[in-house]
C-alpha cells in the first residue's frame, strides 16, 4: 500500500527518509475504495442512522493503523457528520477486521479487497463505499458522498516504487512488464472481481501522482 508513504510526511516530523526524494515510482497497479462497515448487531443500515446512534452511545471504531488512510478517512467522516467514534488502534488490518467481526469493535473503515469477503459472508454489514459512484459489485450500495459527505472519496492504491538511484532504463523495463502483466485478462478479472480497479501509469505519470498525493 504505497498510499501510506504519501501520508507519512504530513503526519511525522522526523522521518528517516523523504519519499519524494528517496523513492522513484515505477507504476501504479490497482486502486480500491474503502468500505464503511459495522458489526451485524449494530442497528443501523445507513450513514445517517449510524451517526445518530453514535451520538447516543459512542461506538468503537477499529483503526487498522494510526495515521493510515482508513484512519484518516474515518476522521474525515466523523468531522463531516458529527459522529462520535471511540478509536481503537490495531497493528494491522487483519486484527481490526477480526475484532469487528467478533463484535469487540462496532465500526470499521478498510480497503475493499480485504473487507468485501466478510460483507458477502454476512459477518459484516455494509454502510457505504468511499467512491464517487456506486459499484455494481456490491449491489449498488449508496456512496458515503451520496449519504451527505459531499465529494467524499478515499481508497487504497497499490504500486511499485524503487530507490531513487535506480537507473531509468530499469524503471522503464519494469514499468512495461508490470503494465503488461496487470492488464492480462486473468489478472484483471481477478482484481476487478475483488473490487479493485486496474490502473497503470508511465513512470513520469506515477511520479506526478505520488508527489501530488
PLM feature spans:
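Small-residue (glycine/proline)-centered packing/hinge motifs flanked by hydrophobic/aromatic residues
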Residues: 13-20, 133-151
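Paired acidic/hydrophobic, glycine-rich loop segments that form the ligand-binding mouth/hinge
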Residues: 1, 60-62, 106-110, 125-128
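Extracellular/periplasmic bilobal clamshell ligand-binding domains
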Residues: 202-213
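Beta->alpha turn/N-cap motifs
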Residues: 1-4, 8, 93, 110-115, ...
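Short helices/loops that flank or line small-molecule/ion binding pockets
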Residues: 54-57, 75-80, 94-104, 108, ...
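Hinge/capping helix and adjacent helix->loop/strand transition within the periplasmic-binding protein
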Residues: 10-95, 144, 157-190
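Conserved helix-loop-beta element of the AMP-binding
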Residues: 24, 50, 123-136
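Short beta-strand and adjacent tight-turn residues that come in two discontinuous sequence segments
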Residues: 28, 90, 109-110, 129, ...
Amino acid at each position: 500500500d504505497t498510499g501510506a508513504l504519501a501520508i507519512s510526511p504530513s503526519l511525522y516530523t522526523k522521518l528517516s527518509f523523504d519519499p519524494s526524494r528517496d523513492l522513484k515510482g515505477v507504476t501504479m497497479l490497482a486502486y480500491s475504495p474503502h468500505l464503511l462497515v459495522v458489526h451485524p448487531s449494530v442497528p443501523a443500515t445507513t450513514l445517517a442512522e449510524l451517526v445518530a446512534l453514535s451520538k447516543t452511545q459512542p461506538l468503537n471504531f477499529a483503526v487498522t493503523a494510526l495515521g493510515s488512510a482508513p484512519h484518516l478517512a474515518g476522521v474525515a467522516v466523523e468531522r463531516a457528520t458529527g459522529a462520535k467514534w471511540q478509536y481503537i488502534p490495531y497493528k494491522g488490518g487483519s486484527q481490526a477486521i477480526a475484532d469487528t467481526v467478533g463484535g469487540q469493535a462496532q465500526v470499521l473503515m478498510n480497503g475493499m479487497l480485504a473487507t468485501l469477503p466478510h460483507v458477502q459472508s454476512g459477518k459484516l454489514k455494509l454502510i457505504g463505499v468511499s467512491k464517487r459512484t456506486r459499484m455494481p459489485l456490491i449491489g449498488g450500495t449508496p456512496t458515503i458522498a451520496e449519504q451527505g459527505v459531499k465529494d467524499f472519496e478515499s481508497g487504497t492504491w497499490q504500486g511499485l516504487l524503487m530507490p531513487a538511484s535506480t537507473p531509468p532504463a530499469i524503471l522503464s523495463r519494469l514499468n512495461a512488464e508490470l503494465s503488461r502483466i496487470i492488464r492480462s485478462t486473468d489478472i484483471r478479472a481477478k482484481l476487478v472481481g475483488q473490487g479493485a480497479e486496474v490502473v497503470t501509469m508511465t513512470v513520469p505519470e506515477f511520479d506526478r501522482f505520488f508527489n501530488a498525493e
